[in-house]
């Protein structure tokens, strides 16, 4: 399929009731990265670049809940002090396997032309995410990669910074994905792009917060049995009417692809 408008003159309303512009992307598809696109937590994966492929207990003991980004800043600093360079870390990121079926899913999405606008929101880091996606051949699919800024400093060592500040009590201090997605939607609205539906593919607890932006007709794709899925189930049980989006748990990315294929058939 080369586009979303096989019928001449077919136009649809966006989520806010506006008429969708011809040729504009109809659906926003948002992906998480760790344990969603890739089948590992990339912050754990880079330990393979450390001496002895492990971190000292004194460093691991500095982690505090809600301040994981600050902890990872210390991890990157330690790795740099041990002689680990960005090229060494890139080599690790490039070998992290995709989740089962993810390569096929991303190829399928890429073939849909203007149907989907695809973005990535990740609490990992830009250097790692982009390294992995380029190695897998999928970097160009994503219109925007929204992650904690990282890159070599003047000494040639990899550094990490927080994405932003926010006031959300549920999310880590460095990133609230609800805020990230909300700001992106406002930005695209200013560009004149109004999506008909939102699709969100994730796994972690921090992927639950942006679920508040999803409305009826939108779809949440939580990885089955992971924190995002459990939090959605708890919310549905506590107050069934409060969770408006359709929920499609996935075990492999083929589950996501199958549902998206059904969506396109109904367009």
Curated annotation (Swiss-Prot):
InterPro entries per record: HAD-like_sf, HAD_hydro_PyrdxlP_Pase-like, HAD_sf, Pase_PHOSPHO-typ
Obligatory cofactor(s): Mg(2+)
Keywords: Hydrolase, Magnesium, Metal-binding, Mineral balance
Disulfide bonds: none
Lineage: superkingdom: Eukaryota
GO molecular function, one term: pyrophosphatase activity
Database matches in CDD domains: HAD_Pase
GO cellular component: extracellular matrix; extracellular membrane-bounded organelle
PANTHER family xrefs: PHOSPHATASE, ORPHAN 1, 2, PHOSPHOETHANOLAMINE_PHOSPHOCHOLINE PHOSPHATASE
Known function: Phosphatase that has a high activity toward phosphoethanolamine (PEA) and phosphocholine (PCho). Involved in the generation of inorganic phosphate for bone mineralization. Acts in a non-redundant manner with PHOSPHO1 in skeletal mineralization: while PHOSPHO1 mediates the initiation of hydroxyapatite crystallization in the matrix vesicles (MVs), ALPL/TNAP catalyzes the spread of hydroxyapatite crystallization in the extracellular matrix.
Family membership: Belongs to the HAD-like hydrolase superfamily. PHOSPHO family.
This protein's name: Phosphoethanolamine/phosphocholine phosphatase
């Amino acid at each position: 399929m080369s586009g979303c408008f096989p019928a001449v003159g077919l136009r649809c309303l966006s989520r806010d009731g506006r008429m969708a512009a011809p040729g504009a992307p109809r659906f926003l598809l948002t992906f998480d990265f760790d344990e969603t696109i890739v089948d590992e937590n990339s912050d754990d994966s880079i330990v393979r670049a450390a001496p002895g492929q492990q971190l000292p207990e004194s460093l691991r003991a500095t982690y505090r809940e809600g301040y994981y980004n600050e902890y990872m800043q210390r991890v990157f600093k330690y790795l740099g002090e041990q002689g680990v360079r960005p090229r060494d870390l890139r080599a690790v990121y490039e070998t992290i396997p995709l989740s089962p079926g993810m390569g096929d899913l991303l190829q399928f999405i890429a073939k849909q032309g203007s149907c989907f606008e695809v973005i990535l929101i990740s609490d990992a880091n830009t250097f790692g995410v982009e390294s992995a996606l380029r190695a897998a051949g999928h970097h160009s699919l994503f219109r925007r990669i929204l992650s904690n800024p990282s890159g070599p400093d003047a000494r040639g060592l990899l550094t990490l910074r927080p994405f932003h500040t926010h006031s959300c009590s549920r999310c880590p201090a460095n990133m609230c994905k609800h805020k990230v997605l909300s700001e992106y939607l406002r930005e695209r609205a200013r560009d004149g792009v109004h999506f008909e539906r939102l699709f969100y593919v994730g796994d972690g607890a921090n992927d639950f917060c942006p679920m508040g932006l999803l409305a009826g007709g939108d779809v949440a794709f939580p990885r089955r049995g992971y924190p995002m899925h459990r939090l959605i189930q708890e919310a549905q049980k506590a107050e069934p009417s409060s969770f408006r989006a359709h929920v499609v748990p996935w075990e492999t990315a083929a589950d996501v692809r199958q549902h998206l294929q059904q969506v396109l058939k109904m367009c």
